[in-house]
Amino acid sequence: MRVAINCLRLDPSFVGGVNTYARGLLEGFANVANGHQFQLYASDWNQGLFESFRHRKNFEVIVLDERTQSLRKSICRVALLSFSEKLYESTSNLLFRGIREMMDREADIVYTPTTFLQCFNSQRPTVLSMHDIQQVHHPEFFSWPRRLSRRITYGLSARHACFFQASSEFTKQDLLRHFRCISAEQIAVIPEGVRVEEFATPVDTISLRSRYAIPERYLLFPAQLWLHKNHMVLLQALKQIESKSGMKIPLVLTGGKFSSASRVLGYIAEQSMNYVHYLGQVPFTDLVGLYQNAAFLVMPSLHESNSLPVLEAAAAGTPVIASRIPPNEELARVLHLNLFDPLDQEELEGLLVRLWEDESAAVTQAIHNQRNVTSYSWDSSAVQYLQLFERALEAK
């Protein structure tokens, strides 16, 4: 089976999220290829992301000349502003015709790991990872152009993709509720994985703490500064703990500055929370060390389609405090997670104080999670993807 993987929209400047997911899945494909061939379609802009796959057996990195990419994007934006799905569809099909024809000619199936299809008239079976439809649940987190873009591109993708991958049962049911054109048979629930060996291999955390000037014991929240990540409830809970008891629980934040950055960083400064350390984007090896040295991972997100940081923490031997949202509840059937209502600051306060003071519970939870997270491997996920691709081929 020849699989074309459309990686053209992966942003090399973005750390984590879909990039971590794509890298893990590609490594899984490399390990379980079993004769299948993978064509990675990249651009001059992002080809560096796939350097390690250039000389892998069963892989071919195809770099497209994208000198007209910015022009194409501009034309697509104009088409979106027409508010017409039909115009956007025909525009995309025309602009990306050459790319589509190449994939149709060279591959048996086309897989897109980045939320929506680039064009909507592929002659080959298409499989899509839509990841989430957060805009439906939290439209307030999106500008009106972004909401418009998602409405049109996701709607067209829902109608034209042949099969879908969902990272959780919640995501599958969410897609079925909001896209009546999709049937349950078209969606395969394939959990995301974690490269356990990478997160379990010890890192020199002493030099790491020295370089970043962080304390020996801290909470870790590795997430881009987006509104749905819900940084404020964690910061406000920590400030209340300080106000009530004088206890200052150190927190380390990593991730790029996005829609909530000014509010988050402004609050830290205004409240004189010098025990909160914002490191920005950090190299992957440093992130592994931060996980391994953390007392707890804290993930207060309001909405997620998956729980990659939870899996990474489990692999690193770090216990987890996380919001009580459906994907985390699904993971809690296998892992020991300390869940809380992400809208209940007082519940989080109590949980933080209790767990911070009970180191024995943390050790027990970490051992349990590190033992059980091995069932979430990218190799296992890759096998399930290949089974989905074969289903799509049989159904054509």
Positions of predicted regions on the chain:
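Carbohydrate transferase catalytic cores enriched for Leloir-type hexosyltransferases
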Residues: 1-396
